From Swiss-Prot:
Keyword Lyase attributed: yes
SUPFAM superfamilies given in the database record: Molybdenum cofactor biosynthesis protein C, MoaC
Pathway, per record: Cofactor biosynthesis; molybdopterin biosynthesis
Subunit and partners: Homohexamer; trimer of dimers.
Recorded name of the encoding gene: moaC
Binding-site residues for substrate, renumbered to this chain: 75-77, 116-117
Annotated PANTHER family: MOLYBDOPTERIN COFACTOR SYNTHESIS PROTEIN A
Name of this protein: Cyclic pyranopterin monophosphate synthase
Pfam families per record: MoaC (PF01967)
Species of origin: Staphylococcus aureus (strain MRSA252)
Length: 164
């Protein structure tokens, strides 16, 4: 059974000491999504939302979220991130509902991974889209948020299988 590394001998929270870990290149890819109605889909696609360019703003929010993960997730180490990218892809197969898939990729060269940074970026991106379009419809659905893959580090690589 795997031990919880964020709990000390007294059962209290602690930040894991990574001093003795090797510096390696680490990358994580996360996914989230938001399902919107046709009006919001058209506003985003045509860049006609009254609050501005929704995707550009959400992309910046995702980047900022990755950079600030250690300030909102208590046991995350502050990391010198070397790359952050946010991609969007529309799924139009269930019209009149449209799902915007969000993929975030975060990289570093360091002693601990960037999974939480990628997940935080994906979440903040979806939340920003909700915030910027909620005046049109509050019934949007933020979908599953999960780690797609990670590479580097002691625990090795991870690739989510389609049936997970």
């Amino acid at each position: 059974m795997t031990e919880f590394t964020h709990i000390n001998q007294q059962g209290h929270a602690k930040m894991v000491d990574v001093s003795d870990k090797q510096i390696t290149k680490r990358t994580a890819v996360a996914h989230s999504s938001i399902t919107v109605n046709e009006t919001i889909y058209k506003q985003i696609s045509n860049n006609t939302n009254t609050k501005g360019n929704v995707l550009n703003t959400a992309q910046i929010a995702g980047i900022m979220a990755a950079k600030n993960t250690s300030t909102i997730i208590p046991m995350c180490h502050p990391l010198p991130l070397t790359g952050i990218d946010v991609h969007f892809n529309w799924d139009e197969t269930n019209a009149p509902l449209y799902t915007l898939n969000i993929q975030t990729t975060v990289s570093t060269t360091g002693k601990t991974g960037v999974e939480m940074e990628a997940l935080t970026a994906a979440s903040a991106t979806a939340l920003t889209i909700y915030d910027m379009t909620k005046a049109v419809d509050k019934g949007m659905i933020i979908g599953e948020t999960y780690l797609e893959s990670k590479s580097g580090g002691k625990s090795g690589d991870f690739q989510r299988q389609l049936d997970q």
